[in-house]
């Protein structure tokens, strides 16, 4: 969410609003940050895994996963282009 919010902030402000975040008089960056927190809280409250390691992804698989994701056709619909290095950084953050 944070990665894409830089290029399509209005989408993420709408998500934040839908999650109950107060948007009045606040910067997009503040609202988006609170929206991301709200989504993380919802995920945890639902008992869903929040880390790749919780679903059995080994850390050593992350570079290959990033390379595969960089050429996966769905990535071309992403609002912000991503390199395999950027994808790897995101995967490491959620591992």
Question: Which residues make up each language-model segment?
Answer:
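Gly/Pro-rich interdomain helix-loop hinge
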Residues: 1-61
């Amino acid at each position: 969410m944070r990665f894409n919010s830089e290029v399509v902030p209005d989408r993420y402000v709408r998500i934040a609003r839908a999650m109950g975040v107060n948007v009045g008089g606040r910067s997009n960056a503040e609202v988006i940050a609170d929206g991301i927190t709200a989504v993380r809280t919802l995920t945890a409250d639902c008992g869903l895994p929040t880390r790749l390691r919780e679903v059995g992804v080994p850390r050593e698989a992350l570079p290959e996963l990033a390379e595969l994701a960089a050429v996966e056709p769905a990535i071309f619909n992403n609002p912000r282009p991503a390199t395999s290095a950027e994808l790897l950084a995101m995967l490491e953050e959620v591992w």
